Amino acid sequence: MGMGMMEVHLISGKGLQAHDPLNKPIDPYAEINFKGQERMSKVAKNAGPDPIWNEKFKFLVEYPGSGGDFHILFKVMDHDAIDGDDYIGDVKIDVQNLLAEGVRKGWSELPPRMYQVLAHKIYFKGEIEVGVFFQRQG
């Protein structure tokens, strides 16, 4: 079993689509979850469909540990102070192979790339660019 730190780099979004009845630019942000550890990006105020976040988030990892669901879950939202935040879509990144390799050799990386944002698992709502790095500790 290996312990380590996983760093998730949320870089940007492209073509994010949210329903805004007033046609205002969207204010996207992402909620990020890994095995119950939750993080939240900054709101990209008035960024519209192509936000730049360039934020890094750290998660403590125990691999293989308990439970077998090794996915990073992103819930992409549009901040709306007046009538509540609007759901845009989700991204699910499987990191099991990344963690297995990282435990074996000391580190591992998923270079940044675009991932499709899907609403209700089927409706394309744009993309987010994400990279992931894992470093074994001890």
Curated annotation (Swiss-Prot):
InterPro entries, alphabetized: C2_dom (IPR000008), C2_domain_sf (IPR035892)
Coiled-coil residue windows: none
Entry keyword annotation includes RNA-binding: yes
Residue numbers binding Ca(2+) 2: D20, D78, D80, D86
Residue positions binding Ca(2+) 1: D20, D27, D78, D80
PROSITE patterns linked: C2
Pfam families found in the cross-reference section: C2
Tissue and organ expression note: Sieve elements of leaves, stems, roots and flowers.
Start and end residues of each C2 domain: 1-108
A GO term for molecular function: metal ion binding
Name listed for the protein in its UniProt record: 16 kDa phloem protein 2
Organism ancestry: Eukaryota, Viridiplantae, Streptophyta, Embryophyta, Tracheophyta
